[in-house]
Amino acid sequence: MAKQYDSVECPFCDEVTKYEKLAKIGQGTFGEVFKAKHRKTGQKVALKKVLMENEKEGFPITALREIKILQLLKHENVVNLIEICRTKASPYNRCKGSIYLVFDFCEHDLAGLLSNVLVKFTLSEIKRVMQMLLNGLYYIHRNKILHRDMKAANVLITRDGVLKLADFGLARAFSLAKNSQPNRYTNRVVTLWYRPPELLLGERDYGPPIDLWGAGCIMAEMWTRSPIMQGNTEQHQLALISQLCGSITPEVWPNVDKYELFEKVELVKGQKRKVKDRLKAYVRDPYALDLIDKLLVLDPAQRIDSDDALNHDFFWSDPMPSDLKGMLSTHLTSMFEYLAPPRRKGSQITQQSTNQSRNPATTNQTEFERVF
């Protein structure tokens, strides 16, 4: 067994012992993430341990896909894969060596920043965050890659204020359907609260609009400080989407009745679209409201794409996008969702945010309850 694992681990990879682990900063179904530093140079990195537990036939295909995609993507707003390291198989690790993906270290993730009441984004800074996020999406989509897990926790920000799309564990290449043969991608992707309605209805021939829906959820979250639709089940998530974006019908979404689950799930009837009405108490800027409204369109064919979103008046009206470095320089501690206190389900944010100045929704608490 040891020999088998040693052969599937890259034999030309360095030992991970060249790095010293400093702290765990993330954990999930994907494995664990650690902050670490290079023992000789002192360079700070993030080590993502590849989960091997259920892989009886060698290296996980999902990890191979992630590595291949990250080696392809080189952009300021996409996380940078430095190298791949390993530990050798031995009796001490049940003859299972480990693989680590080594990334440039980013000091924060967006979910961690939004969880802290002391972090206050101005409207200009929100514009810069969304501009970088959409730039990253534009780049990966131009390179025919879908992220498929857009959420605030997967948006990293460096201490210099540079945003990086991260966690490409669910990402995949996409292509336009050819010869009337639709693609058959899995629809069991994207964290539930950020999952678009087409995936919830069983669509398997999808494309970049699924990531733009997530971008819309994240953009609204910049003001609400909380995921805006927190369903407990897929059925519940569809109900929340209908309550915000209007009932899902063929009148507003042509051919939606052709989706596999359209007749099988109970869809809320008689709901009017009220994205702007529901969010205007938080989002005071009319251009911001309009862009969120265009990102959270039910029909993926009518949902705004990253190119048009970047040309939206939101980014070209006063105040213009401004650098995050100054604001972040006042926060010396890294902020990650994993390190934030656990949230109590069911509580509501009642504060309203102007974000026109450094005085968004605040309370006497140190942390926001991230429930909208």
Curated annotation (Swiss-Prot):
<dbReference type="GO" id="GO:0045944">
    <property type="term" value="P:positive regulation of transcription by RNA polymerase II"/>
</dbReference>
<dbReference type="GO" id="GO:0003682">
    <property type="term" value="F:chromatin binding"/>
</dbReference>
<protein>
    <recommendedName>
        <fullName>Cyclin-dependent kinase 9</fullName>
        <ecNumber>2.7.11.22</ecNumber>
        <ecNumber>2.7.11.23</ecNumber>
    </recommendedName>
</protein>
<keyword id="KW-0547">Nucleotide-binding</keyword>
<keyword id="KW-0808">Transferase</keyword>
<comment type="function">
    <text>Protein kinase involved in the regulation of transcription. Member of the cyclin-dependent kinase pair (CDK9/cyclin-T) complex, also called positive transcription elongation factor b (P-TEFb), which facilitates the transition from abortive to productive elongation by phosphorylating the CTD (C-terminal domain) of the large subunit of RNA polymerase II (RNAP II) POLR2A, SUPT5H and RDBP. This complex is inactive when in the 7SK snRNP complex form. Phosphorylates EP300, MYOD1, RPB1/POLR2A and AR and the negative elongation factors DSIF and NELFE.</text>
</comment>
<feature type="region of interest" description="Disordered">
    <location>
        <begin position="343"/>
        <end position="372"/>
    </location>
</feature>
<dbReference type="GO" id="GO:0106310">
    <property type="term" value="F:protein serine kinase activity"/>
</dbReference>
<dbReference type="GO" id="GO:0008353">
    <property type="term" value="F:RNA polymerase II CTD heptapeptide repeat kinase activity"/>
</dbReference>
<keyword id="KW-0597">Phosphoprotein</keyword>
<feature type="modified residue" description="Phosphothreonine; by CaMK1D">
    <location>
        <position position="186"/>
    </location>
</feature>
<dbReference type="GO" id="GO:0016605">
    <property type="term" value="C:PML body"/>
</dbReference>
<keyword id="KW-0963">Cytoplasm</keyword>
<comment type="subunit">
    <text>Component of the super elongation complex (SEC), at least composed of EAF1, EAF2, CDK9, MLLT3/AF9, AFF (AFF1 or AFF4), the P-TEFb complex and ELL (ELL, ELL2 or ELL3). Associates with CCNT1/cyclin-T1, CCNT2/cyclin-T2 (isoform A and isoform B) or CCNK/cyclin-K to form active P-TEFb. P-TEFb forms a complex with AFF4/AF5Q31 and is part of the super elongation complex (SEC). Component of a complex which is composed of at least 5 members: HTATSF1/Tat-SF1, P-TEFb complex, RNA pol II, SUPT5H, and NCL/nucleolin.</text>
</comment>
<keyword id="KW-0234">DNA repair</keyword>
<dbReference type="GO" id="GO:0070691">
    <property type="term" value="C:P-TEFb complex"/>
</dbReference>
<feature type="modified residue" description="Phosphoserine; by CDK9">
    <location>
        <position position="353"/>
    </location>
</feature>
<keyword id="KW-0804">Transcription</keyword>
<dbReference type="GO" id="GO:0004674">
    <property type="term" value="F:protein serine/threonine kinase activity"/>
</dbReference>
<dbReference type="GO" id="GO:0120187">
    <property type="term" value="P:positive regulation of protein localization to chromatin"/>
</dbReference>
<dbReference type="GO" id="GO:0005524">
    <property type="term" value="F:ATP binding"/>
</dbReference>
<dbReference type="InterPro" id="IPR050108">
    <property type="entry name" value="CDK"/>
</dbReference>
<dbReference type="GO" id="GO:0008024">
    <property type="term" value="C:cyclin/CDK positive transcription elongation factor complex"/>
</dbReference>
<feature type="binding site">
    <location>
        <position position="167"/>
    </location>
    <ligand>
        <name>ATP</name>
    </ligand>
</feature>
<feature type="compositionally biased region" description="Polar residues">
    <location>
        <begin position="347"/>
        <end position="366"/>
    </location>
</feature>
<feature type="modified residue" description="Phosphoserine; by CDK9 and PKA">
    <location>
        <position position="347"/>
    </location>
</feature>
<feature type="binding site">
    <location>
        <begin position="104"/>
        <end position="106"/>
    </location>
    <ligand>
        <name>ATP</name>
    </ligand>
</feature>
<dbReference type="InterPro" id="IPR011009">
    <property type="entry name" value="Kinase-like_dom_sf"/>
</dbReference>
<dbReference type="GO" id="GO:0005737">
    <property type="term" value="C:cytoplasm"/>
</dbReference>
<comment type="similarity">
    <text>Belongs to the protein kinase superfamily. CMGC Ser/Thr protein kinase family. CDC2/CDKX subfamily.</text>
</comment>
<feature type="region of interest" description="T-loop">
    <location>
        <begin position="166"/>
        <end position="191"/>
    </location>
</feature>
<keyword id="KW-0805">Transcription regulation</keyword>
<dbReference type="InterPro" id="IPR017441">
    <property type="entry name" value="Protein_kinase_ATP_BS"/>
</dbReference>
<keyword id="KW-0832">Ubl conjugation</keyword>
<feature type="domain" description="Protein kinase">
    <location>
        <begin position="19"/>
        <end position="315"/>
    </location>
</feature>
<keyword id="KW-0007">Acetylation</keyword>
<keyword id="KW-0227">DNA damage</keyword>
<feature type="binding site">
    <location>
        <position position="48"/>
    </location>
    <ligand>
        <name>ATP</name>
    </ligand>
</feature>
<dbReference type="GO" id="GO:0008023">
    <property type="term" value="C:transcription elongation factor complex"/>
</dbReference>
<feature type="modified residue" description="Phosphothreonine; by CDK9">
    <location>
        <position position="354"/>
    </location>
</feature>
<dbReference type="GO" id="GO:0006366">
    <property type="term" value="P:transcription by RNA polymerase II"/>
</dbReference>
<feature type="active site" description="Proton acceptor">
    <location>
        <position position="149"/>
    </location>
</feature>
